[in-house]
Structures are given as C-alpha cells and as structure tokens.
Amino acid sequence: MTHLSDLDIANQATIKPISEIAEKIGIPEDALEQYGHYKAKIDINKLDDKGDRGKVVLVTAMSPTPAGEGKSTVTVGLADAFHELGENVMMALREPALGPVFGIKGGATGGGYAQVLPMEDINLHFNGDFHAITTANNALAAFIDNHIHQGNELGIDQRRIEWKRVLDMNDRELRKVVVGLGGPTQGVPREDGFNITVASEIMTILCLSTGLKDLKASIANITIGYTRDRKPVTVADLKVEGALAMILKDAIKPNLVQSIEGTPALIHGGPFANIAHGCNSIIATETARKLADIVVTEAGFGSDLGAEKFMNIKARKAGFEPSAAVVVATIRALKMHGGVAKDDLKEENVQAVRDGLANLERHIENIRSFGVEPVVALNAFVSDTEAEEQVVEDWAKEHGVRIALTEVWEKGGKGGVELAKQVQEVLNEKHDFKHTYDLDLPIEEKIEKVVTNIYGGNKVTFTSGALKQLKQIKENGWDNYPVCMAKTQYSFTDDKDRLGAPDDFEITIRELQPKTGAGFIVALTGAIMTMPGLPKKPAALNMDVTEDGHAKGLF
C-alpha cells in the first residue's frame, strides 16, 4: 500500500482563513496581525485577560531513534483528539530550524493527518522570527568587535569573548573561524566561531521572556566576555540592549496557525533540547492558557532533556505546572534499546521490545518524580506487529501505567481519542508538583541531582577546565541559577551508543557556560556540538520546488 507523503497530505488539506481560527478561539480582530491568509502574529497586549488559565499537558518521549518517534505528530494529534471530544484546546509548539529541515529530519510540523499548516511556510522561514533572532545575535557580535576596534574602552579581553555569531543552518566548517583579517582598517584579528541559531542565547531569552520589558532586561544581562582581570562584561556595559530588543519587537509575538482539522496552534521559538532548554516560548504557552481550557505542548527529545528543563527551567520561570504528561513510545525505539541494529528495526522482535521497556520505564519514573502522572502514547507504525504491541500493553497493565495505542498519523484526531480520554482522567486528578532541585543548592549539587535522579547515574566528574569555570561562577554570584544540561538525546549517559537504561555510569562535565541573560548555567557533556554538521546524504537531496512555487520533498 502506497501512503501519501506528509507534504501531499498537507497540500490536499482544506485550510481555513486564519481570521476564522482566531475568531473561534476568542482572539479580537485588533490583536491579529496577519501574514497572508493563513498565518498571523498575536499582539498579546490586546487580548482580554479573564484571569482563568488552561491546564497544561506536556508531551515528551522515551530516548529516540535518529529518525525521531513522532512526538510532534502525537502532540498535534492529541490536540485534534481533544477537539474531537469537544474540548476548548490549543497547542503550543516550537518552530522548526532550517538546518535540521535540510539535514536529517526533514520537515518538523507533525506528520500524516496530524500536521500543522501551512506546512511549507512553517518549515521555511515562517514569519521571520529566526531571521530576527539571527540578526539580533550577529548585531551584538558586530557591536562587540566595533567596540574593540574603536579603542576598547571597556577593556574587553579578545581571548575571552564568549559571544559567537550564528546561522540557521548545519555548517560544521564555521565552528571555528578567524575574523578581523586584512589589516588595521578591517578590525582586530581574533578567533571566533558560529553556533546554530537555535543555540543562541537570544533564542533562549526570547523563549523565557514574559514580555518586551523582560526581554530587554534579560538581553542587558548577557555576559559577552571578560576583561583582562576576568571581570564580566555585559550587554548593558555596551548600552545596546534597546537596539537588540527593537530588532525582536515583532519576533516576540507568538504565531497563530492551525492543524489539518482546524485546531488552533501557537508556534513560537525553537531552542534545541540537547544544547538548550528545548521548549517553545513562555509567551505562547501563557497566551494559549488564557484562550483555551487545555494546552497541549511539547519539549524536545526525552524526559531526560526537554521535559526535565520544562519542569526545572521553563515552568519555574513562568510560574505554572503541567497537570498531565504524555510519554511517546514506539516499537522501533523499544527494539533499538533492546539491542536491535538500526537496519533491522522493521523486523519483528518481541524479546527486544521486552528488553527495551527498561528505557521507557525510566522515562515514566522521571515524569512521576515531578509529581505528574504520565500516559504512554504507543505511536503506531506500519512495521509494528500485534505481538509486539501486546508485549507493551501487557507490561503497562502489570506496572499500573496508563497506555493508549495512538494512530494519529493515519487517522488524525480520531486516532488519538483513546489517548485523549486517558489524559482527561489524569487532568481530573490532584497532583503534587515538585522540581528536581532547589535553586539555592550549589551548581555541582544541582547537576548531581539531575544525573542521579533523572539519568540514573551514580557520579559526576568535572574536568579541570570545568572546575575553574565553576569557581568563577561562584565568584560572580551566578550559582543560584538552574542548570541546563547539554547531553546526547540517544542515551541517559553522555555516550550516545550506551542505550537502554544503564545505572552504573558517571557523567563528565567538560565545560560550564554561564548564560546570565537567559538565567541558567549550561553544563556540556560528551561530544555535544552547538553547531551541527550535515549528514552524508542530507534531506535536501530529495527537495525541489515546482515552477508554480510549491515545495517538494519536505517529507
């Protein structure tokens, strides 16, 4: 049986004018800033605030395969299923980054009949937010280099500049560069480098800000580098926070689109979860909570990355808590964690599924450690067999875990109704939300609590360089920040090839990066890169555009 591609399904869908979607959810006309017929930004200052706030459902996943387990698809399908059940629901998602779109993932707007539209636009530039973030980031880099060129009044040490330029593309050649070459009129030569835009602190700040005032204050707090006597230099010292916030004045407004079934969706911000905090913007989530009774949102990768940071960073900053969580699992991911090679994941292997359940179980335990009850969404693929699915369902029943076979890729919202009903049950229960650590703990203890309580490790070690950075963090009074772990998404450890649910391991912290604008400390582990590279056969090889301007190959 031949299935339509995600792009074909999206192109065949009937999409409503965005003004209709806005009216349905209660957004006044003067708050809607349309970008064509099917996309808009929302001026949150013009929304009526009735005081009520919707309940948040967080969608996370088990440790994924390289292809992903369909978390965005399940998020969209679950929202559509709530809509099918008559609930007043919205979803709040991250924007796709162009680098991964052209790299290994292709499009990132859900899949099958559980997609957000217009799919082409969202995957390619959307409403210009990433361009604005890239511009603001690189404007700051230009201001820094210009300050040094014009006499360096602040005494910035060129060897200790922490701010890098960014690009919304996977480009390994730009990880390390030299700028300022060409003589006295071309600037001051120094080593520099590029990150991908989603790793920019500007991206994180936009996603953690509650408004323009908060955005500008956070930008002012960014530490761009140090003087020769190792005193921090901030954006406030350069006096350019106003200019940078001005560049972002429209980007901070959340973007309104819709699913194939007409469910409203706010898509805003897109930090990665393995190198940043991996959640959409607080502004989008809070806007959805003002407008809907249920808000379905997602956090990148598994409970050890995006969900952990959602709980300990985003929810803490925003002052809300999730009322339920969904853990997306797939038969293929279970088999991978049960020892099956990537090329054999489509072959039936009941024992491997059984062995891989240890990984899923740890993710369930992680969600419960926050005082939130999870529901497992077993996301169906055509290669799954009844025997494999039965193993998972029997295990869930034996362990008291709610589970629903989820077929939203094939059936849209109707394929997620059972999942939505299970989540409804959880939403009606009381829960006692808690964080993994208190903010007044030392940085090293916060990291240790994440490693032992979330990853299942037994020890944390710091390189000599990280220990020096830890000392500097304490001297500068930054040790009351939360921690943002930069770690592989494929394993609970810092080794991407150590799958399953190991418990006899240590995590090595090789670098600590204070993100004083965003308000957290990044702890880098393993071989995590903040500028990815493209694979040998990037998804771009299958992409094209027709003579009438329609994209091809966006999955």
Curated annotation (Swiss-Prot):
Organism per entry: Staphylococcus carnosus (strain TM300)
Which residues does ATP bind?
Answer: T65, P66, A67, G68, E69, G70, K71, S72
Example GO molecular function term?
Answer: ATP binding
Query: What InterPro entries would the database entry show?
Result: Formate_THF_ligase, Formate_THF_ligase_CS, P-loop_NTPase
Give the EC number(s) listed in the UniProt record: 6.3.4.3
Q: Which gene encodes it?
A: fhs
Catalytic activity, reaction form: (6S)-5,6,7,8-tetrahydrofolate + formate + ATP = (6R)-10-formyltetrahydrofolate + ADP + phosphate
Q: Name the Pfam families for this protein.
A: FTHFS
Q: Which family does it belong to?
A: Belongs to the formate--tetrahydrofolate ligase family.
Q: Which UniProt keywords apply?
A: ATP-binding, Ligase, Nucleotide-binding, One-carbon metabolism
Q: What's a BP term from Gene Ontology annotated to this protein?
A: tetrahydrofolate interconversion
Q: State the name under which the record lists this protein.
A: Formate--tetrahydrofolate ligase
- Highest taxon of the lineage: Bacteria
Its UniProt pathway annotation is: One-carbon metabolism; tetrahydrofolate interconversion
